[in-house]
Amino acid sequence: MSEYRVNHEPVFMLASSPWRESSLWVEAFSRRYGRVALLARSARKRQSELRGVLVPFVPVSVSWYGSQELKTLHRAEWVGGWRQPQGRALFGGLYVNELVLKLTAREDPVPELYDALAEVMEAVCCKAAYIDDLRRFEWRLLNLLGVAPDLNRDGDGGTIAAGGTYLVRPETAVFPVGKGFAVPPHAAGVVAPGQSLIDLREGSFRTAESLQQALKITRLFIRHLLPEGLKSRQVLEQIRQFDRKETARETVPTSDGTASNAV
């Protein structure tokens, strides 16, 4: 295969790791070429122009060459965008990057996924409330991967009804069930109201219940695809557990027998 060059391609940096003495191995998701592996030579040197450019969560314009799976990056430019995520939002960005990194194949172009990635990254970095955006992104990703069930019609051919109740499972259609139906122990599935499925399909979460059901459904499918779990989610859960322990430790009884926070 002859060597080819790509110039000024918009990408998002998904992950990077040291390569030999001073270089970086970068995994990036591009709009026209999908996920690509890039070797950024000398990028870890102090004088490298790439040090402040190869950052996650914001769009970057890059140029590369090479015919092998690992391309050589020879130029990168920050194209403007938004600030880096702060606080807990950082884990939202890491979570999105890990999903794309683990669920996409190299050099499989999906322009719609790049657009979805740009939208959710802007939301995570710029909005105080971005949970809706995460659920929308997860569902779009599952649809683009071809693993999301049809939420227009159920497995019997009927239209999803707002007042109905449905069983959602991986690798099969959505089926109507009675309101008292429960998923058997150790079985993978979510019982959800029809309105919640409609809201998930439309990406418009009208109630807290719809948003909670969306979380259950997207988590069900992601666990099915990635049974080993996600590091970003595990780290965030550890932080939450630490916060709960600290809150419990700092809560002391007052003289009237009630509890108050000591700090």
Swiss-Prot record:
<keyword id="KW-0234">DNA repair</keyword>
<dbReference type="Pfam" id="PF02565">
    <property type="entry name" value="RecO_C"/>
</dbReference>
<dbReference type="InterPro" id="IPR037278">
    <property type="entry name" value="ARFGAP/RecO"/>
</dbReference>
<dbReference type="Pfam" id="PF11967">
    <property type="entry name" value="RecO_N"/>
</dbReference>
<dbReference type="GO" id="GO:0006302">
    <property type="term" value="P:double-strand break repair"/>
</dbReference>
<feature type="compositionally biased region" description="Polar residues">
    <location>
        <begin position="252"/>
        <end position="263"/>
    </location>
</feature>
<dbReference type="InterPro" id="IPR022572">
    <property type="entry name" value="DNA_rep/recomb_RecO_N"/>
</dbReference>
<dbReference type="GO" id="GO:0043590">
    <property type="term" value="C:bacterial nucleoid"/>
</dbReference>
<dbReference type="InterPro" id="IPR003717">
    <property type="entry name" value="RecO"/>
</dbReference>
<dbReference type="InterPro" id="IPR012340">
    <property type="entry name" value="NA-bd_OB-fold"/>
</dbReference>
<keyword id="KW-0233">DNA recombination</keyword>
<protein>
    <recommendedName>
        <fullName>DNA repair protein RecO</fullName>
    </recommendedName>
</protein>
<feature type="region of interest" description="Disordered">
    <location>
        <begin position="243"/>
        <end position="263"/>
    </location>
</feature>
<comment type="similarity">
    <text>Belongs to the RecO family.</text>
</comment>
<dbReference type="GO" id="GO:0006310">
    <property type="term" value="P:DNA recombination"/>
</dbReference>
<dbReference type="InterPro" id="IPR042242">
    <property type="entry name" value="RecO_C"/>
</dbReference>
<comment type="function">
    <text>Involved in DNA repair and RecF pathway recombination. Involved in pilin antigenic variation.</text>
</comment>
<keyword id="KW-0227">DNA damage</keyword>
